[in-house]
Regions:
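N-terminal, motif-rich segments that launch catalysis or mediate targeting to/interaction with membranes
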Residues: 1-73, 78-81, 99-203
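Catalytic Zn2+-binding segment of zinc metalloproteases
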Residues: 90-102
């Protein structure tokens, strides 16, 4: 939301502040009961975890559609929670392991590093403008492709802490900018709901 304010999207920022608790519930829910198993997507072969048709691409689109569905029914609690869950999936895809689909490639260590250092390292935050795309699929493809590029860029760095720092600097900024972009897209889609009286289906 800080990025939205910095870029002058005050109306949008205030809207999301109202429903921040619901969004946070969705962010947490997205990782519960092994749902994170499907937060993987390789943009090269367009697949997630082996043997499963559900992946970060299908899940993010499903959550987004459900968010629109519930809000079209005036159910902001579930609608904003689904939006938060969608944001979680989009954010996960900025991490190389989620795009490479390799659970054992220092995945937990990297996430622990980010949790421990996110508030301490100023370079992990950005005020750059939101990334604007037309749909959720574009965000999934861009974030996962960027994650693969980060992995390639820093793969030969021997020191794990240095590698984590460099990947986190880029991945976290991408996460913030893409989330802000999704917020703007979702806000605009909600405005269309009011104007068009469009019917959405639960996915």
């Amino acid at each position: 939301m800080d990025i939205l304010k910095e870029d002058g999207y005050d109306t949008e920022a205030k809207f999301y502040e109202i429903f921040e608790s619901y969004i946070n519930e969705g962010l947490v829910w997205a990782d519960q009961d092994f749902k994170s198993y499907f937060h993987f997507y390789n943009p090269k072969n367009k697949r997630g975890m082996y043997g499963h048709s559900t992946n970060a691409m299908t899940l993010a689109n499903s959550y987004y559609k459900n968010a629109l569905y519930f809000i079209s029914k005036n159910d902001y609690k579930n609608g904003m929670a689904y939006f938060g869950a969608m944001c979680h999936v989009i954010q996960d895809l900025t991490i190389p392991q989620h795009a490479k689909i390799k659970l054992l490639d220092s995945h937990k260590q990297f996430e622990s590093y980010v949790k421990s250092n996110y508030k301490k390292v100023k370079r992990f935050k950005t005020n750059e403008s939101p990334l604007l795309y037309k749909n959720i699929s574009d965000y999934v493809n861009f974030n996962s492709t960027s994650a693969l590029n980060l992995d390639y860029m820093y793969k030969n760095i021997p020191n794990q802490q240095t590698k984590f720092y460099l990947v986190a600097c880029n991945a976290l900024k991408l996460s913030q900018r893409s989330t802000a972009g999704c917020m703007l897209m979702f806000f605009n889609d909600l405005e269309k709901i009011k104007q068009e009286d469009k019917i959405y289906e639960y996915n």
